[in-house]
Amino acid sequence: MTPAEIAPKDRLIVALDLPSVDAAEAMIARLGDSVTFYKIGYRLAYAGGLPLVARLADKGKKVFLDLKLHDIGNTVAQGVESITRLGATFLTVHAYPQTMKGAVEGRGGSNLKILAVTVLTSYNEDDLHAAGFRLGVAELVEARAQQAQVLGIDGLVSSPEEVGALRKIVGHQMSLVTPGIRPAGSASGDQKRIMTPGRAITAGADYLVVGRPVVEAAEPKAIADAIQAEIGQALGA
């Protein structure tokens, strides 16, 4: 699917960063037909949320399984092979060469798309230097993107700040997925490299991941609808 073929409604991925399956299912019910794509991360996955992937798929929803796998290639390959049976659309791995290579091997001929996480959106230059990286955020993101493209990764996860540069590097051959999205007036929380939905889409993002601004809202459906409307405006839809 080319970027032009992605409907505005399908570009919003709501992060179900909730404490239980019951809480997640209640949120899904409140959002109804407004949301077609959900993210399941550590918190929900380890609270019994993995079977929810298949249940959502049966309802025609898509699931982004955000597990950020990072291990030796063989272990990742075996894990990803098992994950292909869950019915998820996207799966994240960290953008290290052995990890990415193993994920592509484990995916095989399935429909699962592998996304490489470049640099977490909670990191800035100081955090990278403290962790021993000599490259800055932009340089490291671009280097990892180039490696991911060579290894056959389907898409990249980065902050919206790097999307424009990444689009120039990978063209439209890879999907660009951006967390760190905050509607105007929302608290940034623990995110350090953030952007509004419209600006992120204009910069070149294909999919936007939004969690707390939606799931912690008094009226989550209204917030999701507003974000999708902003996406549509940015696309000229």
Swiss-Prot record:
Keywords: Decarboxylase, Lyase, Pyrimidine biosynthesis. InterPro entries: Aldolase_TIM, OMPdecase, OMPdecase_AS, OMPdecase_bac, OMPdeCOase_dom, RibuloseP-bd_barrel. One of its GO terms (molecular function) is orotidine-5'-phosphate decarboxylase activity. Pathway: Pyrimidine metabolism; UMP biosynthesis via de novo pathway; UMP from orotate: step 2/2. Transmembrane segments: none annotated. Its EC number is 4.1.1.23. The active site is at residue 68. Pfam families: OMPdecase. It comes from the Bacteria. SUPFAM superfamilies: Ribulose-phoshate binding barrel (SSF51366). One of its GO terms (biological process) is 'de novo' pyrimidine nucleobase biosynthetic process. It catalyses: orotidine 5'-phosphate + H(+) = UMP + CO2. One of its GO terms (cellular component) is cytosol. Substrate binds at residues 17, 39, 66-75, 121, 182, 191, 211-212. Catalyzes the decarboxylation of orotidine 5'-monophosphate (OMP) to uridine 5'-monophosphate (UMP). Belongs to the OMP decarboxylase family. Type 1 subfamily. Homodimer. NCBIfam families: PRK00230.1, pyrF. PANTHER family: OROTIDINE 5'-PHOSPHATE DECARBOXYLASE. This is Orotidine 5'-phosphate decarboxylase. It comes from Bradyrhizobium diazoefficiens (strain JCM 10833 / BCRC 13528 / IAM 13628 / NBRC 14792 / USDA 110). The gene is pyrF.
